[in-house]
């Protein structure tokens, strides 16, 4: 499906902002699919941010020590479904982000079982979670695309050729603190999602994603981006990252080994399914040809269409 409402006239790629209180899916999709990312101001309230920090602050203990993914001045926390239910429910589960993921990375297909035709729909699941605390002296990160874990090799296209399903990942970056060029704000290259996968990133085209606490940046998995150096004397930059992925692909983070079943039960049935504790239509992720929700004793079966 080609994404509609592209700009009527060719416009330069750049960084755009919308207001969470006044925008909608229809307002976001044209900008997101044209530029590759955009800022949603005020997506998360200050009260929710405080709750998230209370849940995650104790886990920020030591810097990254495995080169070259992050700087040693970056403290990284993963496995966030088991550490911050507030982040998962309020950010990953935010209605606006859910709508964006559903529109762009829901998997659709049709097949035959004998003469009978079946149409399958599989909504996205949580793919990855990371909380970042970057301290003064943090080094510049190299440009990368979030979809590389999923072998998503893409050809170059024109902006009006973009179709839902081209990307397999959509990421949400939530500012836990003020983020500036000086304290390490993420850089991204607008329009890079339209380039072929092995195109060499051009840093001269990068822009800084400067945000206030509670602002969020939505980006497509094929968009080049990277963390920047923190050249301040004492500012800490905190950023929370959650990503949706096509449910027919392997999740980047192994959520099933990091989230005990008793904590799974604390989430709503809808969120349990978005975390991946559910079969994917038609039969992905079954246990002895049964819905995992049945085997695990979770409420509400998956919304799948069995074909046998």
From Swiss-Prot:
<dbReference type="GO" id="GO:0051213">
    <property type="term" value="F:dioxygenase activity"/>
</dbReference>
<dbReference type="InterPro" id="IPR008775">
    <property type="entry name" value="Phytyl_CoA_dOase-like"/>
</dbReference>
<comment type="subunit">
    <text>Homodimer.</text>
</comment>
<keyword id="KW-0479">Metal-binding</keyword>
<comment type="function">
    <text>Dioxygenase; part of the gene cluster that mediates the biosynthesis of penifulvin A, a potent insecticidal sesquiterpene that features a [5.5.5.6]dioxafenestrane ring. The first step of the pathway is performed by the sesquiterpene cyclase peniA that generates the angular triquinane scaffold silphinene via cyclization of the linear farnesyl pyrophosphate (FPP). The cytochrome P450 monooxygenase peniB and the flavin-dependent monooxygenase peniC then catalyze a series of oxidation reactions to transform silphinene into penifulvin A.</text>
</comment>
<dbReference type="Pfam" id="PF05721">
    <property type="entry name" value="PhyH"/>
</dbReference>
<dbReference type="GO" id="GO:0046872">
    <property type="term" value="F:metal ion binding"/>
</dbReference>
<dbReference type="GO" id="GO:0009058">
    <property type="term" value="P:biosynthetic process"/>
</dbReference>
<protein>
    <recommendedName>
        <fullName>Dioxygenase peniF</fullName>
        <ecNumber>1.14.11.-</ecNumber>
    </recommendedName>
</protein>
<feature type="binding site">
    <location>
        <position position="225"/>
    </location>
    <ligand>
        <name>Fe cation</name>
    </ligand>
</feature>
<feature type="binding site">
    <location>
        <position position="144"/>
    </location>
    <ligand>
        <name>Fe cation</name>
    </ligand>
</feature>
<keyword id="KW-0408">Iron</keyword>
<keyword id="KW-0223">Dioxygenase</keyword>
<keyword id="KW-0560">Oxidoreductase</keyword>
<comment type="similarity">
    <text>Belongs to the PhyH family.</text>
</comment>
């Amino acid at each position: 499906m080609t994404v509609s409402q592209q700009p009527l006239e060719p416009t330069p790629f750049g960084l755009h902002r919308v207001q969470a209180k006044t925008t909608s899916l229809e307002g976001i999709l044209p900008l997101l699919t044209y530029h590759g990312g955009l800022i949603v101001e005020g997506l998360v309230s200050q009260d929710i941010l405080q709750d998230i920090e209370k849940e995650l602050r104790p886990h920020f203990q030591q810097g990254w020590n495995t080169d070259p993914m992050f700087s040693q001045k970056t403290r990284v926390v993963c496995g966030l479904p088991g550490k911050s239910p507030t982040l998962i429910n309020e950010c990953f589960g935010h209605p606006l982000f859910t709508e964006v993921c559903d529109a762009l990375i829901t998997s659709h297909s049709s097949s035959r079982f004998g003469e009978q035709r079946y149409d399958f729909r599989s909504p996205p699941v949580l793919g990855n979670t990371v909380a970042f605390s970057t301290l003064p002296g943090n080094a510049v990160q190299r440009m990368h695309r979030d979809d590389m874990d999923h072998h998503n090799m893409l050809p170059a296209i024109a902006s009006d050729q973009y179709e839902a399903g081209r990307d397999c990942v959509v990421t949400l970056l939530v500012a836990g603190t003020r983020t500036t060029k000086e304290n390490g704000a993420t850089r991204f290259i607008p329009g890079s999602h339209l380039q072929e996968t092995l195109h060499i990133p051009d840093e001269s085209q990068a822009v800084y994603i400067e945000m206030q606490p509670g602002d969020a940046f939505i980006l497509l998995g094929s968009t080049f981006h990277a963390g920047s150096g923190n050249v301040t004397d004492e500012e800490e930059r905190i950023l929370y990252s959650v990503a949706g992925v096509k449910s027919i692909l392997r999740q980047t983070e192994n959520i099933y080994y990091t989230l005990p079943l008793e904590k799974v039960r604390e989430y709503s049935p809808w969120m349990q399914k978005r975390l991946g504790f559910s079969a994917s239509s038609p039969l992905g992720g079954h246990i002895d040809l049964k819905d995992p929700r049945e085997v695990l004793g979770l409420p509400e079966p998956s919304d799948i269409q069995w074909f046998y």
